[in-house]
Regions:
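Juxtamembrane/disordered regions of integral membrane proteins
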Residues: 1-125
Length: 125
């Protein structure tokens, strides 16, 4: 695992930057515009720290999958689409999220995972 620390940390940094900026600059304002705030208090109050923890967990899982089967970008997109189906598509269908914030979330998730996988791949060489 120590040999993979550079790609893991790099992917986490890129994913955190994309996720945090996308969430705070696009997703939260879209949720506020439709009057849909957070129904529960956050487990981690600081948005940047929360983004970092989420992305680190996702990248560690991605690293594990890549070590088993390879193909970082493909597996990152499988993870992204899975999250989109479980959260965004389902939440729109059951009325827990408006369409505009869900579409913004889809873009953020795809960019986050693509950026993390690209960085992981480049730093693994």
């Amino acid at each position: 695992m120590l040999a993979r620390i550079k790609p893991i940390l790099g992917a986490t940094a890129v994913g955190t930057a994309i996720g945090h900026l996308g969430t705070t600059m696009l997703f939260y304002p879209a949720m506020d515009a439709v009057g849909s705030g957070s129904p529960f208090p956050p487990l981690i109050e600081n948005d940047l720290v929360a983004s970092f923890v989420y992305v680190l967990i996702a990248v560690l899982f991605l690293d594990w999958v890549v070590q088993k089967v390879g193909r970082p970008m493909f597996n990152a997109m499988v993870m992204a689409v899975s999250q989109i189906l479980i959260v965004d598509v389902n939440y729109v269908m059951i009325g827990r999220r408006a369409l505009e914030p869900a579409l913004i979330s889809v873009v953020i998730i795809l960019l986050l995972f693509a950026g993390a996988a690209f960085t992981y791949e480049k730093l693994s060489d």
